[in-house]
Design a protein with these regions (language model features):
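Carbohydrate-interacting regions of secretory-pathway proteins
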Residues: 13-37, 44-294
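Sec-dependent N-terminal signal peptides
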Residues: 1-10
Length: 294
């Protein structure tokens, strides 16, 4: 009985959501993991790209947690994740083929609960100065973004575009025109992607138009055909997001559990920029206005 209680206590300590940073070859990238105590223990992991995937074969041994890295396709010898709980931090590694190692550190994800409703500030036109208020995510990458007829245009696959300003809580209006089979995204605080995609006539899904990629599924999907302008009105307060697409509320004050693939970092408690995804296909944006909380 004592052993069972100790195990339950340790599982509870490890349980929860963790904002992770992986370091490999001097480069860092964000990850996120959600650990469910069980029994049996389970969870989900968000790697640097793609969407959050379920964990299997989770083993908790004292203050340690171990599991094979999840993948969408079967892998004969998956990399192994191991980390130890030290206070409110996780420290560990991902060990891959050939004994390659990626260092992982993490902290418990903040609740981001707001005690009082925000007081909204002055609206900001994010295109008022053209493209001057934006910067490429990768300064050395191919930058296909330009201003044309008051629109922010991406002509093809290249780097993402990021606002120079950062925001905490805000209301964002943004209009988008997606071509046939087009794919882009609107990253809130640079960490949580609202999917932008040619999904006319498709059912709602967390990886379809308006979904929080791999995290939150819309209630409906009033997407318009490719080539037509569509309007988003997004309110983001703490972890809570409301998404209105073409006048219909498709996500209503839903919690975003954690970062999505392609996030700039995993520091969820900090302000972050608006990032527009440009590494997939051509896309056009216009009328981008944000009202930050004071």
């Amino acid at each position: 009985m004592v052993a069972l209680l100790m195990l339950a206590s340790l599982q509870t300590g490890l349980a929860g959501r963790w904002d992770l940073t992986a370091t490999s070859g001097g480069l860092t990238y964000p990850m996120w993991v959600e650990i469910l105590a069980g029994p049996p223990p389970a969870g989900r992991l968000q790697n640097k790209s793609g969407h959050a995937l379920p964990l299997t074969a989770v083993v908790i041994d004292g203050n340690w947690i171990h599991f094979p890295m999840p993948s969408e396709e079967p892998v004969a010898n998956p990399a192994q994740f191991s980390a130890v709980l030290q206070g409110d931090s996780l420290t560990g590694e991902i060990r891959g083929p050939g004994n390659a190692r990626i260092r992982v550190t993490g902290s418990r994800a903040p609740a981001l609960e707001r005690a009082t409703p925000p007081v909204w500030g002055t609206p900001i036109d994010l295109l008022e100065g053209g493209i001057a208020g934006w910067r490429p995510e990768d300064p050395k990458g191919k930058n296909n973004w330009r201003m044309a007829n008051g629109e922010l245009v991406n002509s093809g696959s290249g780097t993402n575009l990021i606002t120079r300003a950062t925001f905490t809580d805000f209301k964002l209006h943004i209009e988008v025109n997606v071509p046939k089979a087009g794919n882009s995204g609107i990253y809130l605080r640079g960490r949580h992607e609202v999917q932008v995609q040619d999904d006319y006539g498709k059912p709602p899904h967390n990886r379809h138009m308006g979904g929080i990629y791999g995290q939150v599924t819309p209630l409906s999907l009033p997407a318009r055909p490719a080539g037509e302008w569509q309007a988003f009105d997004i309110t983001f307060i703490g972890r809570r997001v409301t998404v209105v697409l073409n006048g219909t509320t498709i996500i209503d004050n839903a919690e975003i559990p954690g970062i999505t693939g392609g996030a700039l970092d995993s520091r969820e408690g900090e302000p972050g920029p608006i990032m527009l995804q440009g590494d997939h296909t051509a896309v056009r944006y216009r009328n981008i206005r944000i009202v930050p909380a004071r």
